[in-house]
């Protein structure tokens, strides 16, 4: 989801649906099975496709009256590696991909940057790349039109200037990253001590790498998301909401297992989703 647009892909199938809430939506038909899809804020969609010995990342404009396929980025798995993750910039002009190349006794991970402006066209859309050695890349995600986060098991890098990508912020942690959440202007990491799964520390940074908060937490959770000034932890039947100033807002154990909790425009009302229902819940004010 990005802006007013959301993409829904038939994974292993050959259809991707794009909606903006204003019409019935449009459909992209692919020639190969779909692995994953990401959408930009104007409806341009990046779809990773699976072939027998290769992967193809296609960029489509499903609202175009002409040819909807804008760019095709092929990847040979045996030569360039297996794709781990990818993202498309909110403006639809850049894509970042992460790959793992397996050797006989070790592996290497790397990221590649593609740009679809006149600069990228001069270079067959590939405008840069970087190796992360044997650090496993967990996530690549655009944090603005021109900045992308690359997170690995021991830290992260933020690259800027997507026409000529370069590292603008970099940080390494002594502990392993358990979870990562990206907000509008902040990054939240839960770090875990090796050999002590119960020792968890939440670190909050701005996009320039300045630490905004550090706090030990003891939540049992499976998923962490950040919305505005709140971080929502969910897992099995529990939900914890922590404000970015370090104060707990909500701590509750539900009777049923929950899949997700989302905020609404009303700061005390949330949308709760479980396996069979979608409902509104209102927090009690103290």
Please place each PLM-identified region on the residue numbering.
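A short beta-strand motif characteristic of beta-propeller blades
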Residues: 22-29, 67-77, 122-131, 165-172, ...
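Non-cytosolic head/periplasmic domains of membrane-anchored proteins
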Residues: 1-98
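Repeated scaffold domains used in trafficking and secretory/extracellular systems
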Residues: 1-4, 32-43, 77-87, 128-145, ...
